[in-house]
Design a protein with these regions (language model features):
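Iron-sulfur cluster-binding electron-transfer modules in prokaryotic oxidoreductases
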Residues: 1-142
């Protein structure tokens, strides 16, 4: 069964590289990509990065791999909150000084931590990909 389950960006990249890439319009945005710890450990981060590189017009900055500090539910606990912020502080500083339009991460808990502490809208890679999709039905009506 495990051979039948793929991470979404791995699946999409495989499809795109097999000739099934959708038409995309340029997304003239600068984004910083944060690698979630669990995605890096599983070896799946390269799929997300390669998929994001396929978005035309996108300025992609891959941040150094650092923990956001949330660590699952660790940072949600009141007694760990300050330590959690300290763990992620270098990452938050890098994001705040990046002049990016968005931060991008595959992990929802990283998203919460980044938005709370770096004060930048953070989106999933698939949401960014959706921005680039060309709606064929809209084009036909025009």
């Amino acid at each position: 069964m495990v051979d039948q389950i793929h991470y979404v960006t791995r699946f999409l990249l495989k499809e795109f590289m097999s000739g099934n890439a959708p038409k995309m319009k340029p997304v003239h945005k600068k984004v910083v990509y944060h690698t979630p710890c669990h995605l890096e450990r599983s070896g799946n981060v390269m799929f997300t990065i390669e998929l994001l590189k396929m978005v035309p017009g996108l300025e992609l900055v891959v941040l150094d791999s650092e923990c956001c500090g949330l660590a699952g539910t660790y940072g949600f606990k009141e007694e760990n909150y300050e330590v959690s912020k300290k763990i992620g502080s270098h990452l938050f500083d890098a994001i705040q000084t990046s002049d990016a339009d968005y931060a991008v991460t595959d992990c929802e808990t990283c998203k919460w931590q980044i938005e709370e502490n770096a004060h930048l809208e953070t989106i999933h890679p698939v949401s960014l990909l959706a921005m680039a999709l060309i709606d064929e039905l809209v084009l036909e009506r025009e």
